[in-house]
Protein backbone atom coordinates (compact mmCIF):
# COMPACT_ATOMS: atom_id res chain seq x y z
CA UNK A 1 0.00 0.00 0.00
CA UNK A 2 2.84 2.40 0.87
CA UNK A 3 4.37 1.79 -2.56
CA UNK A 4 1.11 2.04 -4.48
CA UNK A 5 -0.07 5.33 -2.93
CA UNK A 6 2.75 7.49 -4.39
CA UNK A 7 2.67 5.57 -7.69
CA UNK A 8 -1.05 5.48 -8.35
CA UNK A 9 -2.33 8.66 -6.70
CA UNK A 10 0.51 11.16 -7.23
CA UNK A 11 2.69 9.52 -9.89
CA UNK A 12 5.89 9.35 -7.83
CA UNK A 13 8.38 6.52 -7.69
CA UNK A 14 9.49 5.30 -4.27
CA UNK A 15 12.69 3.86 -2.83
CA UNK A 16 11.88 1.38 -0.07
CA UNK A 17 14.21 0.64 2.84
CA UNK A 18 13.68 -1.52 5.94
CA UNK A 19 14.72 -0.03 9.28
CA UNK A 20 16.64 -2.15 11.78
CA UNK A 21 17.51 -1.73 15.44
CA UNK A 22 21.11 -0.73 14.65
CA UNK A 23 20.23 2.13 12.29
CA UNK A 24 22.15 5.38 12.84
CA UNK A 25 22.44 8.75 11.13
CA UNK A 26 24.82 7.15 8.62
CA UNK A 27 22.03 4.88 7.35
CA UNK A 28 19.68 7.82 6.81
CA UNK A 29 21.88 10.84 6.04
CA UNK A 30 25.31 9.36 5.38
CA UNK A 31 28.88 9.65 6.56
CA UNK A 32 32.49 8.67 5.98
CA UNK A 33 32.94 4.95 5.36
CA UNK A 34 36.06 2.85 4.67
CA UNK A 35 36.43 0.95 1.41
CA UNK A 36 39.17 -0.74 -0.61
CA UNK A 37 40.90 1.47 -3.16
CA UNK A 38 42.22 0.49 -6.58
CA UNK A 39 45.59 -0.45 -5.05
CA UNK A 40 43.89 -2.68 -2.45
CA UNK A 41 44.64 -0.16 0.25
CA UNK A 42 41.89 1.12 2.55
CA UNK A 43 40.55 4.56 1.70
CA UNK A 44 37.71 6.64 3.10
CA UNK A 45 34.85 8.01 1.09
CA UNK A 46 31.41 9.52 1.54
CA UNK A 47 28.53 7.05 1.58
CA UNK A 48 25.08 8.62 1.52
CA UNK A 49 22.14 7.22 3.45
CA UNK A 50 18.74 6.19 2.12
CA UNK A 51 17.05 9.61 2.41
CA UNK A 52 19.89 11.55 0.78
CA UNK A 53 20.14 9.03 -2.07
CA UNK A 54 16.42 9.39 -2.77
CA UNK A 55 16.57 13.19 -2.69
CA UNK A 56 19.55 13.24 -5.06
CA UNK A 57 17.57 11.21 -7.60
CA UNK A 58 15.15 14.15 -7.89
CA UNK A 59 17.83 16.46 -9.30
CA UNK A 60 19.42 16.18 -12.72
CA UNK A 61 21.63 19.25 -12.82
CA UNK A 62 21.75 21.65 -9.96
CA UNK A 63 18.88 22.74 -7.77
CA UNK A 64 15.61 24.44 -8.65
CA UNK A 65 12.69 23.37 -10.78
CA UNK A 66 14.75 23.37 -13.99
CA UNK A 67 17.05 20.82 -12.43
CA UNK A 68 14.25 18.38 -11.65
CA UNK A 69 14.32 15.06 -13.43
CA UNK A 70 11.55 12.63 -14.28
CA UNK A 71 12.42 8.98 -13.70
CA UNK A 72 10.62 6.39 -15.83
CA UNK A 73 7.79 8.89 -16.38
CA UNK A 74 7.40 9.51 -12.63
CA UNK A 75 7.45 13.09 -11.34
CA UNK A 76 10.08 12.33 -8.71
CA UNK A 77 11.29 9.94 -6.03
CA UNK A 78 10.05 9.56 -2.45
CA UNK A 79 11.42 7.45 0.39
CA UNK A 80 9.55 4.63 2.12
CA UNK A 81 10.94 3.38 5.44
CA UNK A 82 9.39 0.04 6.33
CA UNK A 83 9.27 -1.12 9.98
CA UNK A 84 9.72 2.54 10.96
CA UNK A 85 9.75 1.90 14.71
CA UNK A 86 12.12 -1.08 14.58
CA UNK A 87 14.91 1.50 14.63
CA UNK A 88 15.67 4.17 17.19
CA UNK A 89 14.29 6.44 14.52
CA UNK A 90 14.67 9.65 16.56
CA UNK A 91 18.40 9.06 16.75
CA UNK A 92 18.64 8.02 13.11
CA UNK A 93 16.64 10.88 11.60
CA UNK A 94 17.21 13.56 14.24
CA UNK A 95 19.15 15.72 11.80
CA UNK A 96 16.13 15.72 9.50
CA UNK A 97 13.87 17.52 11.98
CA UNK A 98 15.02 20.99 10.96
CA UNK A 99 15.66 19.98 7.35
CA UNK A 100 12.07 18.89 6.79
CA UNK A 101 10.95 22.38 7.80
CA UNK A 102 13.63 24.46 6.04
CA UNK A 103 13.79 22.18 2.97
CA UNK A 104 17.59 22.19 3.14
CA UNK A 105 19.86 19.46 4.47
CA UNK A 106 23.54 19.50 5.34
CA UNK A 107 25.28 16.48 3.82
CA UNK A 108 28.92 15.39 4.22
CA UNK A 109 31.35 15.95 1.35
CA UNK A 110 34.85 14.79 0.44
CA UNK A 111 35.85 18.25 -0.75
CA UNK A 112 38.96 19.72 0.85
CA UNK A 113 38.05 22.34 3.44
CA UNK A 114 34.30 21.85 2.91
CA UNK A 115 33.05 19.20 5.35
CA UNK A 116 29.37 19.85 4.60
CA UNK A 117 27.28 21.34 1.83
CA UNK A 118 23.59 22.13 1.49
CA UNK A 119 21.25 19.82 -0.39
CA UNK A 120 17.87 21.29 -1.29
CA UNK A 121 14.86 19.10 -0.52
CA UNK A 122 12.16 19.37 -3.21
CA UNK A 123 8.92 20.86 -1.93
CA UNK A 124 7.03 17.80 -3.15
CA UNK A 125 9.39 15.25 -1.57
CA UNK A 126 7.83 12.97 1.05
CA UNK A 127 8.94 10.28 3.49
CA UNK A 128 6.44 7.49 4.18
CA UNK A 129 6.98 5.28 7.21
CA UNK A 130 5.14 2.02 7.85
CA UNK A 131 4.92 0.67 11.37
CA UNK A 132 3.13 -1.96 13.40
CA UNK A 133 2.31 -1.05 16.98
CA UNK A 134 1.21 -4.55 18.04
CA UNK A 135 4.61 -5.98 19.02
CA UNK A 136 5.41 -3.42 21.71
CA UNK A 137 8.22 -5.49 23.30
CA UNK A 138 10.50 -5.05 20.30
CA UNK A 139 9.66 -1.53 19.20
CA UNK A 140 11.16 1.88 19.85
CA UNK A 141 8.88 4.72 20.88
CA UNK A 142 8.44 7.77 18.69
CA UNK A 143 9.05 11.16 20.27
CA UNK A 144 6.55 13.99 20.09
CA UNK A 145 9.05 15.96 18.01
CA UNK A 146 9.17 13.20 15.41
CA UNK A 147 5.42 12.63 15.42
CA UNK A 148 4.80 16.32 14.77
CA UNK A 149 6.63 15.99 11.44
CA UNK A 150 4.33 13.23 10.16
CA UNK A 151 0.63 12.68 9.59
CA UNK A 152 -0.48 9.32 11.02
CA UNK A 153 -2.98 7.13 9.18
CA UNK A 154 -4.22 3.97 10.86
CA UNK A 155 -4.86 1.05 8.51
CA UNK A 156 -7.15 -1.37 10.33
CA UNK A 157 -7.67 -5.05 9.59
CA UNK A 158 -10.52 -5.95 7.20
CA UNK A 159 -13.95 -6.19 8.80
CA UNK A 160 -15.96 -9.40 8.93
CA UNK A 161 -18.32 -7.91 6.34
CA UNK A 162 -15.38 -8.09 3.91
CA UNK A 163 -14.89 -11.80 4.56
CA UNK A 164 -15.41 -13.12 1.02
CA UNK A 165 -13.30 -10.37 -0.52
CA UNK A 166 -10.45 -10.83 1.96
CA UNK A 167 -10.43 -14.58 1.37
CA UNK A 168 -10.43 -13.98 -2.38
CA UNK A 169 -7.41 -11.65 -2.34
CA UNK A 170 -5.50 -13.74 0.20
CA UNK A 171 -5.99 -16.86 -1.94
CA UNK A 172 -5.22 -15.01 -5.17
CA UNK A 173 -1.93 -13.69 -3.79
CA UNK A 174 -1.07 -17.07 -2.27
CA UNK A 175 -1.53 -18.74 -5.66
CA UNK A 176 0.39 -15.97 -7.41
CA UNK A 177 3.42 -16.48 -5.18
CA UNK A 178 3.26 -20.21 -5.88
CA UNK A 179 3.03 -19.69 -9.63
CA UNK A 180 4.11 -22.57 -11.82
CA UNK A 181 1.85 -25.05 -10.04
CA UNK A 182 -1.60 -26.18 -11.12
CA UNK A 183 -4.05 -25.91 -8.23
CA UNK A 184 -7.03 -27.44 -10.01
CA UNK A 185 -8.89 -27.99 -6.73
CA UNK A 186 -9.54 -24.26 -6.21
CA UNK A 187 -11.22 -21.67 -8.44
CA UNK A 188 -11.69 -17.93 -7.98
CA UNK A 189 -14.79 -15.96 -8.91
CA UNK A 190 -13.11 -12.87 -10.40
CA UNK A 191 -16.38 -11.02 -10.95
CA UNK A 192 -17.77 -11.37 -7.43
CA UNK A 193 -14.38 -11.45 -5.68
CA UNK A 194 -14.84 -14.69 -3.79
CA UNK A 195 -13.96 -18.38 -3.83
CA UNK A 196 -15.86 -20.01 -6.70
CA UNK A 197 -18.50 -22.66 -6.11
CA UNK A 198 -16.52 -25.07 -8.30
CA UNK A 199 -13.77 -25.28 -5.65
CA UNK A 200 -13.30 -28.77 -4.19
CA UNK A 201 -15.64 -28.90 -1.13
CA UNK A 202 -13.08 -30.28 1.33
CA UNK A 203 -10.57 -27.60 0.34
CA UNK A 204 -13.20 -24.88 0.53
CA UNK A 205 -14.06 -26.02 4.04
CA UNK A 206 -10.41 -25.68 5.07
CA UNK A 207 -10.23 -22.21 3.53
CA UNK A 208 -13.19 -20.97 5.55
CA UNK A 209 -12.11 -22.76 8.74
CA UNK A 210 -8.73 -21.04 8.48
CA UNK A 211 -10.44 -17.66 8.07
CA UNK A 212 -12.78 -18.31 11.01
CA UNK A 213 -9.82 -19.25 13.20
CA UNK A 214 -7.96 -16.07 12.26
CA UNK A 215 -11.13 -14.05 12.79
CA UNK A 216 -11.36 -15.37 16.35
CA UNK A 217 -7.68 -14.69 16.99
CA UNK A 218 -8.21 -11.08 15.86
CA UNK A 219 -10.32 -10.52 18.99
CA UNK A 220 -7.06 -10.77 20.92
CA UNK A 221 -4.44 -9.63 18.40
CA UNK A 222 -5.04 -7.72 15.18
CA UNK A 223 -3.38 -9.75 12.44
CA UNK A 224 -3.65 -8.66 8.83
CA UNK A 225 -4.37 -10.41 5.55
CA UNK A 226 -0.68 -11.26 5.05
CA UNK A 227 -1.02 -13.98 7.72
CA UNK A 228 -4.10 -15.39 5.99
CA UNK A 229 -2.15 -15.51 2.72
CA UNK A 230 0.64 -17.51 4.39
CA UNK A 231 -1.88 -19.95 5.86
CA UNK A 232 -3.43 -20.41 2.42
CA UNK A 233 -0.03 -21.07 0.88
CA UNK A 234 0.42 -23.94 3.33
CA UNK A 235 -3.07 -25.23 2.51
CA UNK A 236 -2.35 -25.14 -1.23
CA UNK A 237 0.96 -26.99 -0.91
CA UNK A 238 -0.46 -29.57 1.50
CA UNK A 239 -3.46 -30.23 -0.75
CA UNK A 240 -1.20 -30.49 -3.79
CA UNK A 241 0.83 -33.13 -1.93
CA UNK A 242 -2.42 -35.00 -1.17
CA UNK A 243 -1.97 -34.83 2.60
CA UNK A 244 -4.82 -35.44 5.03
CA UNK A 245 -7.07 -32.32 4.99
CA UNK A 246 -7.29 -32.04 8.80
CA UNK A 247 -3.52 -32.33 9.16
CA UNK A 248 -3.05 -29.71 6.45
CA UNK A 249 -5.19 -27.17 8.30
CA UNK A 250 -3.71 -28.05 11.69
CA UNK A 251 -0.14 -27.66 10.44
CA UNK A 252 -0.93 -24.45 8.55
CA UNK A 253 -2.42 -22.78 11.62
CA UNK A 254 0.39 -24.00 13.89
CA UNK A 255 3.11 -22.84 11.50
CA UNK A 256 1.76 -19.35 10.97
CA UNK A 257 -0.18 -18.39 14.09
CA UNK A 258 1.68 -19.81 17.08
CA UNK A 259 4.62 -17.44 16.73
CA UNK A 260 2.15 -14.52 16.62
CA UNK A 261 0.42 -15.62 19.82
CA UNK A 262 3.39 -16.43 22.04
CA UNK A 263 3.29 -13.04 23.74
CA UNK A 264 -0.41 -13.13 24.62
CA UNK A 265 -1.52 -13.59 28.25
CA UNK A 266 -2.25 -17.13 29.42
CA UNK A 267 -5.98 -16.45 29.70
CA UNK A 268 -6.26 -15.32 26.08
CA UNK A 269 -4.43 -18.33 24.61
CA UNK A 270 -6.55 -20.71 26.68
CA UNK A 271 -9.70 -18.86 25.59
CA UNK A 272 -8.77 -19.22 21.91
CA UNK A 273 -7.98 -22.93 22.37
CA UNK A 274 -11.21 -23.65 24.23
CA UNK A 275 -13.27 -21.71 21.67
CA UNK A 276 -11.89 -23.74 18.76
CA UNK A 277 -12.62 -26.99 20.60
CA UNK A 278 -16.18 -25.98 21.51
CA UNK A 279 -15.33 -25.92 25.22
CA UNK A 280 -15.40 -22.20 25.90
CA UNK A 281 -18.40 -22.20 28.27
CA UNK A 282 -16.85 -25.00 30.35
CA UNK A 283 -13.64 -22.98 30.58
CA UNK A 284 -15.42 -19.86 31.80
CA UNK A 285 -17.55 -21.87 34.25
CA UNK A 286 -14.38 -23.28 35.79
CA UNK A 287 -12.54 -19.96 35.93
CA UNK A 288 -15.42 -18.02 37.47
CA UNK A 289 -15.15 -20.17 40.60
CA UNK A 290 -11.65 -18.95 41.47
CA UNK A 291 -11.28 -15.24 42.44
CA UNK A 292 -7.75 -15.18 41.01
CA UNK A 293 -8.73 -16.84 37.70
CA UNK A 294 -11.92 -14.84 37.57
CA UNK A 295 -10.00 -11.56 37.52
CA UNK A 296 -7.54 -12.66 34.82
CA UNK A 297 -10.31 -13.96 32.54
CA UNK A 298 -12.68 -10.97 32.66
CA UNK A 299 -11.06 -9.35 29.62
CA UNK A 300 -11.14 -12.59 27.59
CA UNK A 301 -14.76 -13.16 28.60
CA UNK A 302 -15.71 -9.67 27.40
CA UNK A 303 -13.91 -10.16 24.06
CA UNK A 304 -15.80 -13.39 23.42
CA UNK A 305 -19.08 -11.62 24.20
CA UNK A 306 -18.14 -8.95 21.65
CA UNK A 307 -17.35 -11.64 19.10
CA UNK A 308 -20.68 -13.43 19.47
CA UNK A 309 -22.56 -10.12 19.43
CA UNK A 310 -24.22 -10.40 22.84
CA UNK A 311 -26.53 -7.52 23.72
CA UNK A 312 -26.32 -6.01 27.20
CA UNK A 313 -22.87 -7.53 27.61
CA UNK A 314 -21.99 -5.17 30.49
CA UNK A 315 -24.44 -7.03 32.72
CA UNK A 316 -22.75 -10.35 31.93
CA UNK A 317 -19.24 -8.93 32.36
CA UNK A 318 -20.20 -7.39 35.70
CA UNK A 319 -21.76 -10.66 36.87
CA UNK A 320 -18.70 -12.63 35.71
CA UNK A 321 -16.35 -10.34 37.62
CA UNK A 322 -18.49 -10.92 40.74
CA UNK A 323 -18.55 -14.69 40.12
CA UNK A 324 -22.32 -14.68 39.81
CA UNK A 325 -23.72 -15.70 36.39
CA UNK A 326 -27.13 -17.37 36.55
CA UNK A 327 -27.99 -20.69 34.85
CA UNK A 328 -30.29 -19.04 32.30
CA UNK A 329 -27.47 -16.63 31.38
CA UNK A 330 -25.06 -19.54 30.85
CA UNK A 331 -27.66 -21.24 28.65
CA UNK A 332 -28.01 -18.14 26.49
CA UNK A 333 -24.24 -17.84 26.16
CA UNK A 334 -23.96 -21.50 25.23
CA UNK A 335 -26.54 -21.09 22.45
CA UNK A 336 -24.82 -18.00 21.05
CA UNK A 337 -21.37 -19.59 21.17
CA UNK A 338 -22.67 -22.65 19.35
CA UNK A 339 -24.08 -20.37 16.63
CA UNK A 340 -21.19 -17.91 16.29
CA UNK A 341 -18.04 -19.90 17.10
CA UNK A 342 -16.66 -22.43 14.63
CA UNK A 343 -15.44 -25.68 16.17
CA UNK A 344 -12.30 -26.76 14.32
CA UNK A 345 -10.59 -30.13 14.75
CA UNK A 346 -7.00 -28.96 15.09
CA UNK A 347 -5.51 -31.08 17.86
CA UNK A 348 -1.91 -29.91 17.51
CA UNK A 349 -2.73 -26.21 17.17
CA UNK A 350 -5.13 -26.27 20.11
CA UNK A 351 -2.68 -28.22 22.27
CA UNK A 352 0.19 -25.84 21.57
CA UNK A 353 -2.09 -22.92 22.45
CA UNK A 354 -3.01 -24.73 25.66
CA UNK A 355 0.69 -25.21 26.43
CA UNK A 356 1.34 -21.52 25.82
CA UNK A 357 -1.32 -20.79 28.39
CA UNK A 358 0.24 -22.99 31.09
Residue ranges and their predicted role:
Residues 1-358:
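C-terminal regulatory/interaction module of P-loop NTP-utilizing enzymes
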